[in-house]
């Protein structure tokens, strides 16, 4: 027996949106999972937990997913912008340093012109590799006495396998409104996420091979860019 509690109204609400999140919830419920959503745990006991509404749940094992917090404490006092990570420019150079310094991975908050000029941290599996490559190019240019050039337009991506469902995502779905473009919410489908008429994310449910076509549509001047 498994019970899930979370503050959001639907599971995976931020990366998937309400409709697809509700579909995932129904799929888990069909496999016997119980949900208590819209609230958190207020008290732990030897044999379970108590929720905000007073519900007490018995449990042999409690697993807490606390998320991630940028570890920037050691950088305090350096006049850097440490609001939600380390602020960098598009080429991964840390903003506010007297000498060239780069930051990469989940800690770096940088603008991605594929979407807009707002600096964001991206906690997706492929970004540490992509930002590391870009930072290496930046440092290589600087060490060679040249100014780094070029737009850095990484494509965020994640996947999740749950029971017989395979989720694959490209772009930043959390920034857009979900639109079902193929299939059904409750089954295999492809969902685009639109902002001001522009595709900024896509999620496929058991449609990984079909996503390549939609992936090319994501972001500013997306076709032909990678």
Where are these regions (language model features)?
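Mid-to-C-terminal Rossmann-like scaffold of FAD/NAD(P)H-dependent oxidoreductases
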Residues: 107-208
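Rossmann-like dinucleotide-binding cores of NAD(P)H-dependent redox enzymes
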Residues: 1-42, 151-159
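Short, hinge-like loop/turn segments at secondary-structure boundaries
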Residues: 19-23, 53, 82
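A general beta-strand register signal
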Residues: 36, 50-51, 161, 194
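FAD-site-proximal beta/loop scaffold in flavoenzymes
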Residues: 48-50, 56-134
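A short, polar/charged loop-to-alpha-helix boundary motif
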Residues: 208-224
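Short acidic-glycine loop/turn motifs at beta-strand connectors
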Residues: 45, 53, 194-198
């Amino acid at each position: 027996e498994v019970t899930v509690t979370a503050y959001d109204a639907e599971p995976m609400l931020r990366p998937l949106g309400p409709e697809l999140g509700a579909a995932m919830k129904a799929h888990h419920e069909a496999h016997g999972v119980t949900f208590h959503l819209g609230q958190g745990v207020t008290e732990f006991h030897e044999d379970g937990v108590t929720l905000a509404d007073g519900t007490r749940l018995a449990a042999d094992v409690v697993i807490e997913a606390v998320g991630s917090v940028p570890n920037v404490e050691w950088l305090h006092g350096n006049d850097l912008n440490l609001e939600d990570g380390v602020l960098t420019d598009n080429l991964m150079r840390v903003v506010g340093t007297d000498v060239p310094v780069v930051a990469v991975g989940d800690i770096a908050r940088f603008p991605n012109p594929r979407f807009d000029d707002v600096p964001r941290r991206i906690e997706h599996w492929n970004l540490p590799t992509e930002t590391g490559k870009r930072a290496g190019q930046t440092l290589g240019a600087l060490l060679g006495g040249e100014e780094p050039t070029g737009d850095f337009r990484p494509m965020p991506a994640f996947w999740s396998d749950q029971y017989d469902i395979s989720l694959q995502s490209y772009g930043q779905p959390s920034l857009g409104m979900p639109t079902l473009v193929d299939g059904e919410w409750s089954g295999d489908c492809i969902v685009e996420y639109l902002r001001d008429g522009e595709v900024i994310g896509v999620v496929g449910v058991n449609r990984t091979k079909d996503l390549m076509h939609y992936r090319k549509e994501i972001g500013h001047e997306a076709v032909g860019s990678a």
